[in-house]
């Protein structure tokens, strides 16, 4: 399962943007299985999802995203092939992985340009809307204020624009600037 998940996330091109290997986002999915129904091949899990962003001209990274998904539940059998199309969401596991891939890429792009991840985050929202039919928890609108729907819906809400700008100012104008001018970077972080 681990190898299948790694291949699915790392071998797929999630956007049309071109990145070098060293520009890839470092993220971790720490999935803890609490129950396995072998008759139906259903894994009941929780997942700690973390993503780090490199700081320009340094060996340092900063945490971009850190969240526990208490409802990381999916169906998987040993030789299942993971296939994903945005237009038709029919597999819980690929939907989960795609959701977090789009969310993390969108957050990362937001940290490099003001609302730079808007298009990718909209794709994440579309995926979430298309996943409303799943019988698995974590997708339903308004069922929980910390589920996947709530996270992406709230992040795209216009009221969150100041927070999104704060992310950009903190990372791009603050941390990244410190390689060129420590004082200016520190000032920008203090002002955010």
Language-model features: where?
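Start-of-domain marker
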Residues: 1-44, 55-57
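Surface-exposed peri-terminal alpha-helical interaction modules
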Residues: 6, 21-24, 65-67, 83-92, ...
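Generic signature of intrinsically disordered, low-complexity segments enriched in small/polar residues
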Residues: 17, 68, 75-79, 158, ...
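Acidic/His-rich structured neighborhood in mature extracellular/periplasmic domains
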Residues: 39-149
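Flexible, glycine-rich surface segments
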Residues: 113-192
């Amino acid at each position: 399962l681990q190898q299948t998940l790694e291949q699915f996330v790392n071998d797929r091109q999630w956007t049309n943007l071109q990145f070098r290997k060293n520009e890839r986002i470092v993220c971790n999915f720490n999935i803890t299985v609490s129950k396995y129904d072998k008759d139906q091949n259903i894994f009941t899990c929780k997942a700690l999802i973390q993503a780090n962003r490199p700081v320009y001209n340094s060996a340092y990274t900063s945490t971009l995203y850190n969240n526990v998904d208490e409802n990381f539940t999916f169906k998987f059998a040993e030789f299942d092939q993971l296939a994903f199309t945005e237009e038709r969401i029919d597999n819980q596991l690929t939907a989960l992985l795609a959701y977090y891939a789009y969310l993390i890429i969108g957050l990362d792009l937001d940290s490099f340009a003001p609302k730079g991840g808007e298009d990718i985050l909209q794709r994440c929202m579309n995926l979430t809307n298309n996943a409303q039919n799943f019988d698995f928890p974590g997708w339903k609108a308004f069922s929980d204020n910390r589920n996947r729907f709530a996270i992406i819906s709230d992040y795209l809400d216009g009221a969150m624009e100041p927070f999104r700008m704060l992310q950009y100012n903190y990372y791009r104008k603050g941390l990244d600037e410190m390689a060129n001018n420590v004082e200016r970077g520190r000032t920008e972080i203090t002002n955010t």
